[in-house]
């Protein structure tokens, strides 16, 4: 980060409780550092025939758009520079790509697909091991 750039935090949001806790943490951290937040919402679905894919694509896109819009609205009054990006890709890939120029990547401990007994989900585990920047994994309710 050079003297003219602002601390960039990338955060993954899928609408789950851990991801919303990660978003709040990102906003709080950006306020402390005078930074900005880039919210990534990814959607990915298995390949299917094109006629069904087109319909599923629109449904998936609109669902992702709605949940990101709701998440951004929940933190809009916080006075932080926040932008959102909807990405059609696997969540881990989307986050890794979006965080290439980031100073910090924040994710929830588990997303919607997580098994209740696991401490980390597959996305948080993958980015923790492969991201090119520091990664913070947030569990709901674990705020200092």
What do the PLM-derived regions correspond to, one by one?
Residues 1-5, 18, 73-105, 142-144:
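Structural beta-alpha unit
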Residues 31, 76, 129:
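Anion (oxyanion) recognition and catalysis
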Residues 107-130, 140, 144:
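Glycine-rich, Arg-bearing micro-motifs that act as flexible, cationic patches
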Residues 55-67:
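A short acidic, glycine-rich active-site loop
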Residues 38-40, 83-87, 136:
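General small-molecule cofactor/ligand-binding pocket signal
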Residues 68-72:
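A conserved short alpha-helical segment within the catalytic HATPase_c
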Residues 2-53, 98:
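Small/aliphatic-rich secondary-structure junction motif
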């Amino acid at each position: 980060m050079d003297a003219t750039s602002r601390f960039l935090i990338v955060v993954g949001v899928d609408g789950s409780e851990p991801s919303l806790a990660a978003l709040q943490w990102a906003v709080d951290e950006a306020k402390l550092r005078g930074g900005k937040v880039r919210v990534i919402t990814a959607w990915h679905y298995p390949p299917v025939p094109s006629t069904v894919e087109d319909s599923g694509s629109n449904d998936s896109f609109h669902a992702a758009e709605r949940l990101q819009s709701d998440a951004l609205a929940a933190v809009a009054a916080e006075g932080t520079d926040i932008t959102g990006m909807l990405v059609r890709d696997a969540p881990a890939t989307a986050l890794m790509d979006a965080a290439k120029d980031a100073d910090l990547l924040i994710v929830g401990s588990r997303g919607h697909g997580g098994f209740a007994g696991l401490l980390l989900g597959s996305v948080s585990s993958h980015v923790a091991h492969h991201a090119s920047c520091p990664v913070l994994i947030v569990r709901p309710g674990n705020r200092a």
